Amino acid sequence: MKNADRGVAAELDGSDLRVAIVQARFNAAITEQLASSCIAELEALGVLAKHIKHVTVPGALEVALALQALAEQKDHDALIALGCIIRGETYHFELVANESGAAVTRVSLEHGVPIANAILTVENEAQAWARADEKGRDAARVAVEMANLMEDLS
């Protein structure tokens, strides 16, 4: 999603879209910033606040299950995954990063719903803060673009 605003359609229109966000609470201050910038961008793109569903889960490994439940409802044009995984001293970082990313992709493919994945995987807290605003906005833009594309392709 790096530079998601480059090479996209000149105007992204989210005015007719319903979007759901699943936010992991682990590293809460960072994921709150991701959510704040994501929601602000969705609204700037025309998504009505009443059409944005925002739920939280304990951590990155729980994001996919909530996404799956939302996808099964078939009430949303796009979903967004928000989280922050910071490398520690053990193998746990790789496990959580790999499994959460694969699970998000699996839900998207199995349900045919676009999911913008903004679960940050970073080496340290400074890297997370440096990305929180931009990646939240990028996730919103990706969700709107892909929802519109899926509508065009159907």
Curated annotation (Swiss-Prot):
InterPro entries: LS, LS/RS, LS/RS_sf. Pathway: Cofactor biosynthesis; riboflavin biosynthesis; riboflavin from 2-hydroxy-3-oxobutyl phosphate and 5-amino-6-(D-ribitylamino)uracil: step 1/2. It is an enzyme of class 2 (transferase). It holds the Pfam family DMRL_synthase. It catalyses: (2S)-2-hydroxy-3-oxobutyl phosphate + 5-amino-6-(D-ribitylamino)uracil = 6,7-dimethyl-8-(1-D-ribityl)lumazine + phosphate + 2 H2O + H(+). The keyword Transferase applies. GO terms for molecular function: 6,7-dimethyl-8-ribityllumazine synthase activity. The active site is at H92. The keyword Transmembrane helix does not apply. 5-amino-6-(D-ribitylamino)uracil binds at F26, A60, L61, E62, C84, I85, I86, N117. SUPFAM superfamilies: Lumazine synthase (SSF52121). One of its GO terms (cellular component) is riboflavin synthase complex. GO terms for biological process: riboflavin biosynthetic process. HAMAP family: Lumazine_synth. Catalyzes the formation of 6,7-dimethyl-8-ribityllumazine by condensation of 5-amino-6-(D-ribitylamino)uracil with 3,4-dihydroxy-2-butanone 4-phosphate. This is the penultimate step in the biosynthesis of riboflavin. Belongs to the DMRL synthase family. This is 6,7-dimethyl-8-ribityllumazine synthase.
